[in-house]
Amino acid sequence: MPRSANLRERILKVAGEKFLSQGFYKVSVDSLVAELRTSKSSIYKFFSSKEDLVATLVDQLNGIINRQLQQIVDHADLGFEDKLLQITRFTGKLLGLVSERFLEDLRIHTPDLWESYQRERQRRIQTYYRRLFEQGIREGLIRDDIDLQLIILAYLQLTELTVQTDELSELPYSGEEVYEHITTLFLEGTLSAG
């Protein structure tokens, strides 16, 4: 890997770790420079601004999520329950890595980026979860007497809780735990008796 590409990847790795765990608003570019042992000009060679760096990280995060969901949903040897379990574990792990502070910073300090992130999350649910729920219906594990679009809309609204940091901070649960509880709550209303 060329040296400049390596530096770009290192910047993304260090910034990603800091931003996702601590949020990005209070993490200074100077602190990234110190940790990377490089200069501001080196960072700005790849990213025009801190917001550009955050946008690149969000794109990277969306790519990781989409690839993993695609891989799980496309796995021909897995049934609905196994796919659901893998998706729940993956999402729970992801929510453990992405702090409430990061999501709050996105919402407050970069509203356009937040809206873009939300649109991608909604598109992801419409795409991958639709396919998952369709499989569950075919396997007789999800009720077929409820409109699929309504199931997806309900799921989308319930999972919105995992990114609403104001409401989440009032609960004694991590984002990961909230997601697990939401999934359980949701499925007990959609699973068939047989």
Can you name each region flagged by the protein language model?
Residues 1-22, 26-38, 52:
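Basic, helix-initiating cap at the start of DNA-binding domains
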Residues 11, 49-55, 64:
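Short amphipathic alpha-helical segment with a characteristic S/N-K-E followed by hydrophobic residues
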Residues 37-47:
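Short hydrophobic/aromatic patch on the recognition helix
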Residues 56, 60, 70-98, 152-155:
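Hydrophobic alpha-helical connector segments
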Residues 81-82, 120, 138-154, 173-177, ...:
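All-alpha amphipathic helical-bundle segments outside canonical DNA-binding/catalytic cores
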Residues 86, 93, 127, 131-139, ...:
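C-terminal peripheral helix-coil segments that are non-catalytic and often amphipathic
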Residues 92, 96-130:
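Short secondary-structure transition hinges
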